[in-house]
Swiss-Prot record:
Keywords: ATP-binding, Ligase, Nucleotide-binding, Protein biosynthesis. This is Glutamyl-tRNA(Gln) amidotransferase subunit A. It comes from Helicobacter acinonychis (strain Sheeba). Gene3D superfamilies: Amidase signature (AS) domain. The gene is gatA. Belongs to the amidase family. GatA subfamily. GO terms for biological process: translation.
Length: 453
């Protein structure tokens, strides 16, 4: 597939040819990365085609978050990131499959069916932005937008072998993103390489008055300023990687060796055990999800239950029929931790621990420029591999820290396991220092000269 950098130099006629080719390939593919062929979404805006995750509003398109409860909902406005794309010679072209309401790590909970990993179709692509990552890795998209709440851009990028960037919280507008966990959610790019990630990030970043959490900063110019000659002081968290598989640990050590050879300084640091971070993350995210998803009641928009007797039954049947099992589980747990008897014991304590984690990251960044960790403890698992929801939640063990602290993080493919499955590694940077993330990743990408195709 042509890169985003290359596509931006195409004429309008060449872009139309590109779009027609993508549309035909999507129709012929069995990955199920797209909800439906792009042309069926009425994708007519001019510009380089960018795949959009099905929780980002595009005016006139049916946006469902891959859930039955939003069946028939047509977005009445553009998300701010879509308007930003239009201002930078890009446009939405197709909607990607995802875990329902972005709640999952495998893209198995979508009402549209599973998405397959293009590297091995018997394996998951990761989630929740699995459709976006599978399409980019499978040659079905020039680039894509995803959303990252606890690793939902970085983990599928790692499983599929592409680049995924979660920007600093507030760097990219969330206006028009259908919320899962408002204090964690962030839109970001999934691309074929670091240069493309930089280009797409620059296009969507910047202050937005329509988003009260948007940082009052100008759009970035990271692509223009990409510099592979910079050298950094990078922290490793040795205690943090003990749960990774042997293949991931080997890739981690080999990548550290490459970083040292480039000239970066490596130091060891410690942070709160990642298992505690998992508990904190899920308490807060489920609490916010239970609040955010209360609006889907079958009255105002989306699916409405039939043959109902009263308002209570309308609410009950619409939500019971519309939500999948994982979403119901998180709503119930979220309501539980917010209930009067348990609010202080769970939710309040989790918020206090979240602040402590943020302070720990800030303390580390007083002495270093970047933190280096794996993205996931394993390579992409087989479908139905996770024996329980808890086992699935643990696949986010290395990614949630950046969401808890609001920091930017990038997933970069660095190796393959003996089965040929991609392995990604993650850099975390100081708040609003995406430039350093992209610079170190660009230099490492060029050094490794890794080709996963």
């Amino acid at each position: 597939m042509i890169t985003l950098k290359q596509a931006l130099s195409l004429s309008q006629d060449e872009l139309e040819t590109l779009k027609n080719g993508i549309d035909a390939n999507v129709r012929a593919s069995d990955l199920n990365a797209y909800i439906k062929a792009p042309s069926l979404n009425g994708a007519s805006a001019k510009g380089v085609p960018i795949l959009i995750k099905d929780n980002i509003s595009v005016k006139g398109w049916e946006i469902t978050c891959s859930s039955k409860i939003l069946e028939g909902y047509v977005a009445p406005y553009h998300a701010s990131v879509i308007e930003n794309l239009h201002q930078n010679s890009m446009a939405g072209f197709g909607l990607s499959n995802m875990d329902e309401f972005a709640m999952g790590s495998t893209t198995e909970s979508s009402c549209y069916g599973i998405t397959k990993n293009p590297r091995d179709k018997n394996r998951v692509p990761g989630g929740s932005s699995g459709g976006s990552a599978a399409a980019v890795a499978g040659g079905l998209a020039v680039a894509a937008l995803g959303s990252d709440t606890g690793g939902s851009i970085r983990q599928p990028a790692s499983y599929c072998g592409c680049v995924g960037l979660k920007p600093t919280y507030g760097r990219v507008s969330r206006y028009g993103l259908i919320a899962y966990c408002s204090s964690f959610d962030q839109i970001g790019p999934i691309t074929q390489n670091v240069e493309d990630a930089s280009i797409l990030f620059d296009a969507i970043s910047g202050h937005d008055s329509k988003d009260s959490t948007s940082a009052n900063l100008k759009p970035t110019q990271t692509f223009k300023n990409l510099n592979r000659e910079r050298r950094f002081k990078i922290a490793v968290l040795r205690d943090h990687i003990k749960d990774a598989s042997n293949e991931v640990q080997l890739a981690y050590e080999n990548t550290l060796k490459a970083l040292k050879e480039i000239g970066h300084e490596i130091v060891e640091k410690k942070i709160l055990d990642s298992h505690y971070q998992i508990s904190i993350y899920y308490i807060i995210s489920m609490a916010e999800a239970s609040s955010n998803l209360a609006r889907f009641d079958g009255v105002r928009y989306g699916r409405r239950a039939q043959n109902i007797k009263d308002l209570k039954e309308l609410y009950l049947k619409s939500r019971s029929e519309g939500f999948g099992d994982e979403v119901k589980r998180r709503i119930m747990l979220g309501n539980f931790v917010l209930s009067s008897g348990y609010y202080d014991a769970y939710y309040l304590k989790a918020q206090q621990m979240r602040l402590m984690i943020k302070e720990q990251y800030n303390k580390i960044f007083e002495e270093v420029d970047l933190i280096f960790t794996p993205v996931a403890p394993t390579t992409a698992p087989l479908f139905n591999y996770h024996a329980s929801p808890l086992e699935m939640y643990l696949s986010d063990i290395y990614t949630i820290g950046a969401n808890l602290s609001g920091l930017p993080a990038l997933s970069l493919p660095v190796a393959k396991d003996p089965l040929g499955l991609p392995i990604g590694m993650q850099f975390i940077a100081k708040a609003f220092d995406e430039q350093s993330l992209l610079d170190v990743s660009y230099a490492l990408e060029q050094e490794l000269k890794l080709k996963l195709d």
